[in-house]
């Protein structure tokens, strides 16, 4: 099992990579690629 402190970090990386993939395929707004910022601001365009 991974240490509990590393799980959110890995989860953020996965979301970030998913955001980059979505950006290249759908050309969404640049702010939507910044997933860590999106999670903090709860930006609707990232849902």
Swiss-Prot record:
One of its GO terms (molecular function) is hormone activity. Main cells of accessory gland and seminal fluid. Residues 1-21 form the signal peptide. Keywords: Behavior, Secreted, Signal. One of its GO terms (cellular component) is extracellular space. GO terms for biological process: negative regulation of female receptivity, post-mating; sexual reproduction. It is found in: Secreted. It comes from the Eukaryota. Responsible for physiological and behavioral changes in mated female flies. This is Accessory gland peptide Acp33A. It comes from Drosophila melanogaster. The gene is Acp33A.
